[in-house]
Amino acid sequence: MTSLTGLALLLCVLASQSWAARVQKTLRIAWEKGAPNGQSREMIFTNGVFPGPELIFDEDDDVEITVHNDMNRNTTVHWHGIAQEGTPWADGVIGLSQQPIRPGESFVYRFKASPPGTHWYHSHERMTLVDGLHGAFFIRPKRDMKDLWSKISNDPKDIDAMSKAALDPKLMVLSDWSRFTSEEYWKAIEDSKLLLFCVDSILLNGHGEVYCPPQEFLVNQTQWGPQHFTFPDQNVTDKGCFPAVEEGIQGPWVNQSLPEKIPAHIQSGCVPSAGSNYTVEVDPADGWVSMNFIAAASNKQVDFSIDEHPMWIYEVDGNYVQPHKFVAAAITAGERFSVMVKLDKQPGRYTIRLPDSGATQVISGFANMVYKGAEHVSPPTKPYVTYGGLSGRPETDTESYAPYNISADYMPPWPANPPAATADEEYLLVMGRAGSSFQYTMNTNYLYPMDFKADRPLLHYPNQTVGTEDEKLVIRTKNGSWVDLILQVAVLPGDGAAFEHMMHKHGSKTWRIGNGAGVWKYKSVAEAIAAEPESFNLKDPGLRDSWLTMFSPVPAGGYWSVFRYQVTNPGPWLFHCHFELHAMGGMSIALLDGVDVWPQVPEEYAVRHHPSQGTQTLAATPNASKPWYNGMLNFMQAVLGILPGQGSEELRR
């Protein structure tokens, strides 16, 4: 009887469990010739394709992905957006969660497929993301989403159609592409001492072309702001590139530049190609389609739209939001926007327009959305956005998503999920260029090398002092605490204009609870909220893993933002700018969350000891001459009341 009772209890327990499937995948990373935009170059293929294969799972699947490095250089793979709850060793960051995967070696990543939604995977080894190591990653949700769809339409047919579309989305990987490899591009920057950010193509799912419109057309398509404030006495090049030798772009370091070192075809010398544009087929019988856009771009902000088809953004960075209707949306490096599109127009071929938003270059990519059975029909259309990212219709000005427009950026989580009213720990990070046009800091002066601690990942040494200078690159937090990260931009010497920074936190999402203009002058966030409550939102702020800092081409005395999160997932997590050029220039910091309850690392992920194969473990780099550094000390003490790499006691409590 006792055994039967025990068996019955066991069966009840088993019946209540949600069994997760174990799903295994293999990725082979290779360096080969390719021509995604019609121009041949060396690049990275994953399983023989670019972008890498789509990885699709169900929520809470136990994922096991074996990565084989068939290249002649190091690599890792980061699973961007995956929570990595309890598996920080699978995050794929050299020097934090693992050593590099060396040539000929393999690495097994094991983690839970969570949270549901749209994510992606990419290299986290220097700038090789832009060489092609990236792909889409999608997790189908368990939950019934009908309440979400009812906010778009109350028609039961529409709700059913959207439910189906969300589980079988069209994954749309956006990337920018250059004829130069990442190493060649960075060498051009170092040799010329100029920040270069011009590309040849914008691709969708690995397809695109090089367009060379007449220069007069490009000049007429240039956004008014950059033209008048950033380079008022010059024009864009025949590639649509902003002029490289311009103080409004390079800052005071333009006088140190060597423009003759810029290789041909980076800034000018447009060569058209015969590539091919991507076509996505949709079935009008389905009623709706979900297009999930992934910004795998290195430094471009793409203003995507579909001619004649408004769209509803319902998911941002793998987090469901209150749906918002737009006709165009600007998406920036690292972000993911999932949109619902109603298929109710005349069947035919409609252009998907993919221009740079106008903040870095006059360039566009194109693709096609084709109604099934109407491939050869081209209904008359009028674009929402033009080649240069300008408004093509009146509604574009009022119904577009622009991250600088705080009202348009109001997309609170669904269901509601507000943060705590107060924080336990606060850290001020003063960000910007430090000592040159292409070196970037997150901590006033110190640069985070891309190979920092490559052979001694901080996962294994969370409480060990990493060196006097290196300590400026590390923040340690306690488990369960609420943390505020205060980001200050456009106040460092020579960096008065607020350039974009796409800030991505690994390991957890953050709420953006506040924005403001000027220099951060408060001893705490609580004091700031009391002084200017209109600058904060604690009721229903947005929740994302990637946020864009404020942008202004005109020096305005600085801008600040406050991001809040709770430490619930102990581990070493990178916080960095997702513009590859800025990260390569040093704009990262290590957040060692929950050092008081650090997880036990499985034996299979222990540090390996072997001769170096081209990997360097570099120290933090103070990048300034002594006079500049002394000036910075005086500035930080007088204006912000803190020293570089430090916070006031109130900020570090």
Curated annotation (Swiss-Prot):
One of its GO terms (molecular function) is oxidoreductase activity. Keywords: Copper, Glycoprotein, Metal-binding, Oxidoreductase, Repeat, Signal. Cu cation 2 binds at H578. Its EC number is 1.10.3.-. Cu cation 4 binds at H501, C577, H582. PANTHER family: LACCASE-RELATED, MULTI-COPPER OXIDASE. This is Laccase ustL. It comes from Ustilaginoidea virens (Rice false smut fungus). The lineage of its organism: Eukaryota, Fungi, Dikarya, Ascomycota, Pezizomycotina. The gene is ustL.
